[in-house]
Amino acid sequence: MADDFSDLRQEYRHVALLEQEADANPVAQFKDWFGQAVDYGVPLPNAMALATATRDGKPNVRFVLLKDVSEQGFTFYTHSVSVKGREMAENPDVALVFYWTQMHRQVRVEGRAHLLSDEEADAYFNTRPHDSRLAVWVADQSVEIESREYLENRMAEIAEQYPGESVPRPATWTGYRVVPERIEFWQGRESRLHDRLLYTREEGGWNIVRLAP
């Protein structure tokens, strides 16, 4: 494989993103774009990069799956004792990025992560497939384990412990809602003259500005 990536280019030829056509509410605009991504056949359109940082500002990023979006924010689920869970506990300022490559679209979200209530976490947990509910009991996310065999043996033990459909939610497995302060929509355009609209939360609503590519 070549080490020089300078010639990896693609021309963007999708539709424009114009102020007069964009929704005044960024959540509504996101839902519109998300629905289009689903209809377009984008694989895993709810995959989003979640960036966190320690109290000292050391960054970390990984992909998680969006499970709900509303006026309250963007919701996902994970272990509170994972690296991201510990980082959000000490520094709740986070960022999200969605990239729908087939449509040449990106959405960036900046906000603060808030823990969901136990009732909300339970409600979602109980909708997960049985094996997925068992899997969260196998080990706390991000801890060191000795082998793949350990995981498989633990899964067998947990399955024996909870043979029926009723599987309790571990206290360390929970949900987070990112309450947005800024949301930017990026649409790739010809000649790299991309469209970028930035929504910033203000008292009583959202301010929209256009950014240079």
Tell what function each PLM region has:
Residues 1-213:
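Binding-site signature for planar aromatic cofactors or substrates
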